[in-house]
């Protein structure tokens, strides 16, 4: 028998501060799910943040239907090392996204060897931020 284990939003946010790998699920035009591996972080007010190319399917999907689900995992993948978050996403384009892209880079990967090079790459790749307001989390089920 499966055992329901509630996950509080604050606990999920703590998880996202430490673990930056995940799979983002968005909805295609026909309603089917589209999933993408992503690097995820947490902004200063507790929203999930993800970098993406502006031309990516996930961005187009979220502009049409902002519902998003993200399964964040640890590097070990199995066991207790995951959490699901759900919420409405918004797309933040450049230049407004640049500070958040820098913040995410520092959080997930540390200092960049050349910030001018990083900013140039973000412009060249037309990077945006997907920001998800965490409305619910989990559930976690064991068994």
Predicted regions and their residues:
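Charged, gly/pro-rich active-site loop segments
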Residues: 1-7, 79-143
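Short, low-complexity Ser/Thr-rich regulatory SLiMs
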Residues: 42, 74, 91-93
